[in-house]
């Protein structure tokens, strides 16, 4: 699909790739890439490839950009889902490849517990996250390339730690949130299975 943002990305990417091949790599490597003997991935971007991030840090500190805008730690699941989408979008502007969150279900579960959310409410929150990371908001009108991991059961290194909501420790642990983890996972699977309004499958998160 044509877009001005996509055209800008294509043109700037070609210029950046030529810079890599003429100024960074030696002639032998550049020639090998041009001939197809080897492939240098994402030459169109002068940056690192993929990165993984701790949801715990976002939950404890909130989302802020120096000199731009600062958000306090999320106190509700809907707010956290919005912050996650924004975080992934921001990080994708600085990296070429995927941005990942680990223990997605474990860290979201306490927010479900604190607000005593229903399955329908959980699904609405997760739905906003999934649609958010599939919106072509990244530079070049691309959706943020995002990965998450689901624990299914609370990891041993987290099960006895106080759960964090709103940047504060709660009077229960992550291990006390297995029921809420199941709710998050159920909602996620249903949303990914159902697809968008036209029934198309979602590309992200992987």
Where are the predicted features?
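Conserved catalytic cores of very large enzyme subunits
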Residues: 1-206
